Amino acid sequence: MPDIAIEVVYALPEKQYLYNVKVPQGSSVEQAIIASGLLQLRPEIDLQENKVGIFSRPVKLHDEVNGGDRVEIYRPLIADPKDLRRQRAERAAKK
């Protein structure tokens, strides 16, 4: 099968990682991430814990990638979005 070109991205507050990778057609999201070498560079990434997506759409590790896809590895949330909204609303009400 021919190779397809995809991107694998992972963003931290201080640095963004973007790798252009060629993988065989029919490869899974997990195979694409492994082929990028990002797991060796950032050992804190745990594919069983971190969610993944393609163009901001959540996908499973076994889903197939297509040419031109951008595979994204998401970091876990550090705060509950509902709590943050509540805190912002309280601060705005005090002003």
From Swiss-Prot:
Family of the protein in this entry: Belongs to the UPF0125 (RnfH) family.
Organism: Erwinia tasmaniensis (strain DSM 17950 / CFBP 7177 / CIP 109463 / NCPPB 4357 / Et1/99)
A Pfam family reported for this protein in Swiss-Prot or TrEMBL: Ub-RnfH
UniProt-recorded name of the protein: Protein RnfH
Tree of life domain: Bacteria
